[in-house]
């Protein structure tokens, strides 16, 4: 459960990303594909080479979904319901992949914002990404 302090840390950090959230989403997705090659199986139609426009575009979609989640941090199930349906029923993404992408998002954010990435912020973002992952996989059951 996200505490009030966690919610503040997440919102403050996300605000500091400014217009870079989409860029970071693409970088994190590319990092996921490079670090965990099995995640590529869901994207056979993509050009997965470094710097791919398709990977960047999908990374922006990920970042946009997270921006929506941050804006609706008190109602994540409601805010992410359609996305949960898509991943559970149509795409059938293995839930472990959300954890892998979450890890790569944390690494990417830490690389770009080392001063702001305090232990408390790291813990709050980790809890937030874990909560988002749980919501996205809730309809798998």
UniProtKB/Swiss-Prot annotation:
UniProt modified residues of type N6-succinyllysine: 7, 11, 16, 40
Modified residues (Phosphotyrosine): 24
Annotated ranges, domain Globin: 1-141
Single GO molecular function: heme binding
Highest taxon above the source species: Eukaryota
Annotated signal sequence range: none
Tissue/organ expression: Red blood cells.
Residues that, per the record, bind heme b: 87
Modified residues (Phosphoserine): 3, 35, 49, 102, 124, 138
UniProt KW Iron keyword: yes
Modified residues (Phosphothreonine): 8, 108, 134, 137
Disulfide topology: none
SUPFAM superfamilies xrefs: Globin-like
Modified residues (N6-acetyllysine): 16
Keyword Iron: yes
Gene Ontology annotations for the cellular component aspect, listed alphabetically: blood microparticle; haptoglobin-hemoglobin complex; hemoglobin complex
Binding partners and assembly: Heterotetramer of two alpha chains and two beta chains.
Family designation: Belongs to the globin family.
Protein name (database record): Hemoglobin subunit alpha
Lineage of origin: Eukaryota, Metazoa, Chordata, Craniata, Vertebrata
